[in-house]
Amino acid sequence: MRPSNRTPAQSRPVTITRQFTAHAEGSVLVEFGDTKVLCTASFEEGVPRFLKGQGQGWVTAEYGMLPRSTHSRMQREAARGKQSGRTQEIQRLIGRSLRAAVDMKLLGENTIVIDCDVIQADGGTRTAAITGACVALVDALNWARGKGILKTNPLKFLIAAVSVGIYKGEPICDLEYIEDSAAETDMNVVMTETGKIIEIQGTAEGEPFSHEELLSLLDLAKHGIREIVDIQKASLS
């Protein structure tokens, strides 16, 4: 039995609140249960130096956790003067995932900067961030089209993400912190709205997992992401 009494395939309640802040071109508060992440998308003219003159755009991401997003206060990384390896890994994952969803030629020489700030953490912050950031990205692209900056929508498809893992010997979907911290296997899966895989991050924290267990976890992820994409679409309608 899971601590929350959810079934193995059951995700936490997912809520997406658009236009959560006033200034960003795209702004979303995404909630996976008690995990809450603020995702903003900023539309900026120009591209990084390595892309100048190539007629294509760029999507990049930054990620951070507020000091009291966790049970005990964390020192701000800005105060330490250095980003952790975890932070760098997660923001690269978010950026890679979102770039897969955008036609960079249609974006033109423009950049979209995604900022994901974890307000409250209870497991699955990176998957929540990707899910919310995708909706913020859609709003930023629509803003640019409304301003006449973009003639064609560069979005190829929606993307979403969910965590899966093996907890007490059983494959489960959307791990909360108490499950994540005790899981034998932990995996994050990013997929398109049609179920195609963008990225899989999977690690055996305890016992190695079998090929059959891997397929079972991917099936759980596909089912969970399908439900999350439906919530994304409802929020955008």
UniProtKB/Swiss-Prot annotation:
Top-level taxon of the source organism: Bacteria
GO MF, one annotated term: tRNA binding
Pfam families: RNase_PH, RNase_PH_C
Keywords carried by this UniProt record: Nucleotidyltransferase, RNA-binding, rRNA processing, Transferase, tRNA processing, tRNA-binding
Class of this enzyme: transferase
Its EC number(s): 2.7.7.56
Keyword rRNA processing: yes
Annotated binding of phosphate, by residue: R86, G124, T125, R126
Any Gene Ontology biological process: tRNA processing
Keyword Cell cycle: no
Reaction(s) the record says it catalyses: tRNA(n+1) + phosphate = tRNA(n) + a ribonucleoside 5'-diphosphate
SUPFAM superfamilies attached to this UniProt entry: Ribonuclease PH domain 2-like (SSF55666), Ribosomal protein S5 domain 2-like (SSF54211)
Family (UniProt): Belongs to the RNase PH family.
Stored PANTHER family: EXOSOME COMPLEX COMPONENT (PTHR11953), EXOSOME COMPLEX COMPONENT RRP41 (PTHR11953:SF0)
Function summary: Phosphorolytic 3'-5' exoribonuclease that plays an important role in tRNA 3'-end maturation. Removes nucleotide residues following the 3'-CCA terminus of tRNAs; can also add nucleotides to the ends of RNA molecules by using nucleoside diphosphates as substrates, but this may not be physiologically important. Probably plays a role in initiation of 16S rRNA degradation (leading to ribosome degradation) during starvation.
Oligomer and partners: Homohexameric ring arranged as a trimer of dimers.
Record protein name field: Ribonuclease PH
Lineage: Bacteria, Pseudomonadati, Pseudomonadota, Gammaproteobacteria, Alteromonadales
